[in-house]
From Swiss-Prot:
Segments of skewed composition (Acidic residues): 928-942
Cellular compartments per GO CC: cell outer membrane; cell surface; extracellular region; periplasmic space
Gene coding for it: yfaL
Cysteines engaged in disulfide bonds, as pairs: none
SMART domains: Autotransporter
Protein name, per record: Probable autotransporter YfaL
CDD domains according to UniProt: PL2_Passenger_AT (cd01344)
Phylogenetic lineage: Bacteria, Pseudomonadati, Pseudomonadota, Gammaproteobacteria, Enterobacterales
Sequence repeat windows: 919-920, 921-922, 923-924, 925-926, 927-928, 929-930, 931-932, 933-934, 935-936, 937-938, 939-940, 941-942, 943-944, 945-946, 947-948
SUPFAM superfamilies registered for this protein in UniProt: Autotransporter (SSF103515), Pectin lyase-like (SSF51126)
Its biological purpose: Probably an autotransporter. Upon overexpression shows increased adherence to polyvinyl chloride (PVC) plates, increased mature biofilm formation.
GO biological process, one term: proteolysis
Alphabetic keyword roster: Cell adhesion, Cell outer membrane, Hydrolase, Membrane, Periplasm, Protease, Repeat, Secreted, Serine protease, Signal
Length: 1250
């Protein structure tokens, strides 16, 4: 059988031709082998393998060159090319044909079931059929790879058919080409398939896979031209049922065209029934049934009068779908019809010329999503028309479908959007300057924003619907207005905004139905120019039942807007710019609803001017009309006008736009607020009066500023966060009302003269400072600074604190009304003698309550006082005013400076700080019973009133200093038997624990716990004379002492602690060393150093050091009268040279030790009874004498401690021998002295002899 193609359009007959070719009379009969490359008679060719050479085949008219039934386990079932080989199959004239049928390569890594070409090899194929070829890997029919060189086309296929070819485990069911330039013209791809293994990495491109994987960004990507080519019934288990394309770096370019030569089917080329599974079980729109494009740019170039149809609306939407992230451009003046679900195409799409028709609803929703996600600020979706190609005409025709575009739909002036009856296009963003026509509907989606420019963009005979929160902006000029007046556009506001502010020719006084027919359930109209006159709602503002009506937005720039009376719109009135003139409440919409007036634009000046006595309170609404702050706004009330409004409200949209905004009250009239407010705006009263009619009209306002000549009247109880300190007007606190400062700015002082009236100023903010003269009552709920303030009213300080503390003493607070205490008074004061400067509270009215006083001692050294330091002055006439206030110092009731504690005492109605305890004089004896009528003597000279006896009150810390100094000098004292060598011992360990207490200076109860550990040992010893003996040793010790001092006057307590170390030498001499009797001498010398702490609650801790020499010389005579009894008189002189360092105490006092070194003497008698049982009882009697007092000097005041200058001691003990060389000694000692001095100490020592 002979088949001859007379014209290219006969390709549609190829399926039947192939069937006949394989019949008994067809190719099956072609058994002769080819005898060269010039085929004159049909023949069967063998497998061709070319390397770097050229092979051109020529097939005579009516003859067949057949490559069939070849099976190979390597790439290229019929033809293998490498190293730039060139392979051509061309008809000699027109009808010579080539057939590749049933060729197979096995193995998943072997490619090209019919032809394999690599390394820039070239294929040029004309009049060719590929049928039933199978590749184990890529390219069921053809595999071609190159390097994207700039030379000729790598793969050229013309007038061909690919049918039933399979890529078993790869890509490209018919053709796989990588890094190549490809030209396909007049080709049919039918029923080709790309499969994949379980790795799900292959199976792309059911018909063709064109890919570029060159990672060199400087190397150009390839391109593919697909002209007059049909794709039907192709499938991919992966992506791209008909076409898969992608690139690694620069986009791969594909041109899919239908040119002028295509005439079949009336010039309509149909691609259909292609599908991709995306590795799933069935067709997937995300996989791209027709095409999946990654980093590729695809151009659909359709010639004039031609149509390319992709998909069939009768099929599932996934079939013939387009998916991916690349760029699609429509060029050519012909038509492109998309009938599938293309919502998984998220790249950009441009219609530059011709028409694109969408045959399925919601089929391009997500165009532009990939780029918009990457760069939301530069977001594009679908573009219709072009600025560069302005001579072209581009159109998107949705017909009667329903289309939604998530991202921008942009139409240029040469773009057209056609929506037929029943159709709808929903947009979220973008603009359109071209033509929007048809009987369908354009919808601006909820919260969307869209711009229509020019009358041509409003040529729909259907509606433009603006949904809730959406904004439709119209732009135009005089010509556009004329066109719209001839054919008005219907706009339906369903909660949206119609913005006409950029429609430059909308004139004052015109009605919006001069070009627009506005209707809907609710919405906002933003007007243009000077006046928006709303006299009802005819065709303009229509409110549905149960819903808010259309809002009125005034956006008048520098102009004014006047509203007609009896407006019936149900929404709010919003002022974005300009001035809204108000003379009647009914101008602002239906008074049954009484919707608020809202200031909305932060960038523009917005004013509401009230020109007559407008009372916005409505009986039907039950409230006044509120003023809502979303931006700065000004309320101007003309002179003589008194107007009542509802509340000053926060931003009800939830955007908190009132924060940072300011309401300014201007004009000489009065603005009265009749409901509690919520705004956080600042409020400025520049002129006239702002008055409250109910409580808390501004409780959350960030600040209130009242300018010179302006007035704020409370009218009721008001909470105000903060008064602006630079205010210079008047704040009138009405009688019976309070103004409470809840969050006052404490960084600057507030001028008290701002306030007047018969009400009460209440400070509820810690740290507020008032200055000057306050002409109203004051209540302090929190800390309030009132240095040098005069209160011409009552001062109530029951729960807060009044402070005059500023680091400078001598300030006054004068109260010319009644003073009621209960809180705290904080003062600065010098703490010296009677002439110390101090802050004072001066009271000129009745007083009551108990006030706690806190004194900050800014300077002073502490001195005894007589009268004291006056801090509270009751200056009123006691015969006319009651003085029942009580004052007491905070905490312990005392304040310390230096060595003295000051307390607060009342004297003749005034209150003083005194550093003495006052001992009242003894009362006089009662008058005796007079004798009857004695002759009176001349009046005797009356005795003067007895002067009270004053005793200074010492601070308890003084006792702590004395304790530490005494402990430092006493801790390491020893007698002869207390160290090694003193009683024949070689090594001695001594542990001492003691406790003493006494009264210092007649008022400080001293207590001290002492503990000491000493270790001593002999270094050298020798003979002295006949039987005398001497010894020299060393000693070291550690002492830890803790105590306290309690004031018997104030009850205060100070704790003290010191711990230290000592090292030194010991020496002993015995007259009769062996007998241990007769005269002896003992001495020691030690250096001691201590770390000391003294602390008092609320007064900090003092840290200081002490160190010095202590030494002793002791003598005695040991007498043995017999029977083991020892009698030993002793005398000891002890040098005490431990001195404390000078230091500054926590109360800033300078503390030093006033007396120098001291000499202590001891006279004693030691006795013991040496028994035969190795236990020796002992008894010691001692008398101690200190010639000097222990003295501390604190800020020039000397405090002496004479309590322990003389004391006696009884000590009993026992010594036991553990072995011949080791013995233990223990004793207990009791001391008593003057001023209740008593000490108990225990001693334990272990001695070793060898």
């Amino acid at each position: 059988m002979r088949i001859i193609f007379l014209r290219k359009e006969y390709l549609s007959l190829l399926p039947s031709m192939i069937a006949s070719l394989f019949s008994a009379n067809g190719v099956a009969a072609v058994t002769d082998s080819c005898q060269g490359y010039d085929v004159k008679a049909s023949c069967q060719a063998s497998r061709q393998s070319l390397s770097g050479i050229t092979q051109d085949w020529s097939i005579a008219d009516g003859q067949w060159l057949v490559f069939s039934d070849m099976t190979n386990n390597a790439s290229g079932g019929a033809v293998f090319l490498q190293q730039g080989a060139e392979f051509s199959l061309l008809p000699e004239n027109e009808t010579g044909m080539t057939l590749f049928a049933n060729n197979t390569v096995t193995g998943e890594y072997n490619n090209g079931g019919a032809i394999f070409a690599k390394e820039n090899s070239t294929l040029n194929l004309t009049d060719v059929i590929f049928s039933g070829n199978v590749a184990g890997g890529y390219g069921g029919a053809i595999y071609s790879s190159g390097t994207n060189d700039t030379g000729a086309v790598d793969l050229r296929v013309t007038n061909a058919m690919f049918r039933n070819n399979i890529a078993n485990d790869g890509k490209g069911g018919a053709i796989y080409t990588i890094n190549n330039d490809v030209y396909l013209s007049d080709v049919i791809f039918d029923n080709n398939q790309a499969y994949t293994s379980t790795s799900y990495s292959d199976g792309d491109g059911g018909a063709i896979d064109v890919t570029d994987n060159n990672s060199d960004s400087k190397h150009p990507s390839g391109y593919t031209i697909v002209n007059n080519t049909a794709f039907t019934n192709n499938t991919a288990e992966g992506y791209g049922g008909a076409i898969y394309t992608n690139s690694v770096t620069a986009p791969y370019l594909i041109d899919i065209s239908v040119d002028d030569s295509y005439s079949q089917n009336g010039g309509v080329l149909v691609d259909e029934n292609n599908s991709a599974a995306g590795y799933g079980d069935g067709p997937s729109s995300a996989a791209g049934g027709f095409m999946y494009l990654g980093l590729s740019e695809v151009t659909f170039d359709i010639a004039d009068g031609k149509t390319l149809v992709i998909g069939n609306t009768e099929n599932d939407g996934a079939v013939d779908s387009i998916a991916g992230t690349g760029l699609i451009t429509k060029t050519g003046s012909g038509d492109l019809v998309l009938n599938a679900d293309n919502n998984d195409f998220t790249g950009e799409m441009q219609i530059e010329n011709g028409e694109v028709t969408l045959g399925r609803s919601n089929s391009l929703m997500n165009v532009g999503d990939t780029h918009c996600q990457d760069d939301p600020q530069d977001c594009y979706g679908l573009t219709i028309g072009s600025i560069d190609q302005y001579q072209n005409q581009a159109e998107l025709n949705v017909g009667s479908t329903q289309q939604t575009f998530v991202h921008a739909l942009t139409g240029f002036q040469n773009g057209t959007l056609n929506i037929d009856a029943g159709g709808n296009v929903t947009v979220n963003q973008g603009s359109f300057a071209g033509i929007i026509e048809g009987a369908g509907q354009l919808t601006i989606a909820q919260n969307g924003s869209y711009v229509l420019a020019g009358a041509q963009s409003m040529a729909l005979t259907g509606d433009i619907v603006v949904d809730d929160g959406a904004v439709l902006s119209l732009e135009g000029d005089a010509a556009d207005l004329t066109a719209l007046q001839d054919d008005p556009q219907s706009i339906v506001l369903n909660g949206g905004v119609l913005d006409l502010s950029d429609f430059s020719t909308w004139q004052s006084g015109t009605s919006y139905n001069d070009g627009l027919e506005v209707s809907g359930s609710s919405g906002t109209v933003i007007g243009s120019q000077d006046v928006v006159d709303l006299a009802g709602g005819d065709n303009l503002h229509i409110g549905g039942d149960g819903k808010d009506g259309v809002y009125v937005v005034v956006d008048a720039s520098d102009g004014q807007v006047s509203l007609a009376n009896n407006n019936s719109y149900l929404g709010t009135t919003q002022i974005a710019s300009g001035t809204l003139m108000v003379s009647d409440n009914s101008q602002l919409g239906d008074t049954h609803y009484n919707r608020q007036v809202i200031f909305t634009d932060k960038q523009q000046e917005s004013v509401m001017e009230i020109t007559s006595d407008v009372d916005t309170r409505s009986d039907a609404a039950g409230h006044g009309r509120d003023i809502e702050m979303r931006a700065d706004g000004e309320v101007a009330v003309d002179a003589g006008v008194d107007t009542q409004w509802g509340a000053l409200m926060a931003d009800s949209s939830g955007q908190h736009q009132d924060e940072g905004s300011t309401l300014t009250k201007t004009g000489a009239g009065t603005l009265e607020l009749t409901a509690s407010g919520t705004t956080q705006s600042a409020v400025r009263v520049e002129e006239g009066t702002l008055k409250g009619d109910v409580a808390d009209i501004l409780p959350y306002a960030s600040s209130l500023w009242v300018g010179d000549g302006a007035t704020f009247v409370t009218g009721a109880d008001q909470d105000i966060q903060s008064i602006d300190a630079i205010s210079s007007g008047t704040i009138d606190i009405s009688d019976g009302t309070v103004l409470r400062l809840t969050g006052q700015d404490t960084s600057v002082a507030l001028n008290a003269s701002l306030f007047n009236g018969d009400g009460t100023l209440v400070n509820a903010t810690d740290g507020v400072t008032l200055t000057g003269e306050l002409n109203t009552n004051l209540e302090t709920d929190s800390l309030t600074y009132l240095s040098n303030v005069t209160v011409n009213g009552n001062l109530t300080n029951t729960s807060g604190a009044v402070s005059l503390q500023n680091g400078v003493a001598g300030d006054t607070l004068t109260v010319n009304g009644d003073y009621t205490g209960g809180g705290t008074l904080l003062l600065d004061s010098e703490l010296n003698g009677d002439d110390s400067v101090s802050d004072q509270l001066v009271m000129n009215g009745n007083t009551a309550g108990n006030t706690t006083v806190v004194v900050n001692s800014i300077t002073g050294i502490g001195e005894p006082t007589s009268t004291g330091i006056k801090v509270v002055d009751f200056a009123a006439d006691p015969t006319q005013f009651q003085n029942n206030a009580q004052f007491s110092l905070a905490g312990s009731g005392y304040v310390n400076m230096g060595a003295y504690d000051y307390t607060l005492v009342e004297d003749n109605n005034d209150w003083y700080l005194r550093s003495q305890e006052v001992t009242p004089p003894s009362p006089p004896d009662p008058d005796p019973t007079p004798d009857p009528d004695p002759t009176p003597d001349p009046d005797p000279t009356p005795d003067p009133e007895p002067t009270p006896a004053y005793q200074p009150v010492l601070n308890a810390k003084v006792g702590g200093y004395l304790n530490n100094l005494r402990a430092a000098n006493q801790a390491f004292m020893m007698e002869r038997r207390d160290h090694a060598g003193g009683d024949g011992q070689t090594l001695n360990l001594r542990v001492i624990g003691g406790d003493y207490h006494y009264t210092a200076a007649g008022q400080l109860a001293q207590h001290e716990d002492t503990s000491t550990v000493q270790l001593s040992g002999d270094l050298f010893s020798g003979r002295w004379g006949t039987d005398g003996e001497w010894m020299l040793g060393i000693v070291g010790g550690y002492s830890d002492n803790q105590g306290d001092s309690r004031s018997n006057m104030t009850g205060t307590r100070a704790d003290n602690q010191n711990h230290g170390y000592a090292v030194g030498l010991t020496s002993s001499w015995f007259q009769h060393g062996n007998q241990k009797q007769g005269a002896w001498l003992d001495s020691w010398l030690q250096y001691a150093w201590f770390s000391n702490d003294v602390s008092e609650q609320e007064d900090g801790t003092d840290h200081y050091h002490s160190s010095g020499i202590i030494a002793s010389l002791e003598a005695g005579y040991q007498w043995l009268p017999g029977r083991g009894v020892v009698i030993e008189p002793q005398a000891q002189v002890i040098y005490q040279g431990v001195q404390q360092d000078d230091f500054t105490a926590a109360n800033r006092a300078r503390v030093s030790q006033s007396q120098g070194d001291d000499i202590q003497t001891r006279l004693g008698l030691h006795s013991e009874w040496r028994t035969a049982v190795h236990v020796i009882p002992t008894l010691d009697l001692n008398y101690y004498h200190d010639p000097h007092s222990t003295e501390i000097e604190e800020d020039g005041s000397t405090i002496s401690d004479d309590a322990v200058k003389q004391r006696g001691e009884i000590k009993v003990g026992v010594t036991g021998n553990i072995s011949q060389r080791v013995s233990l000694r223990g004793s207990v000692a009791w001391q008593k002295g003057s001023d209740d001095f008593a000490q108990t100490a225990g001693f334990l020592s272990m001695t070793v002899k060898w």
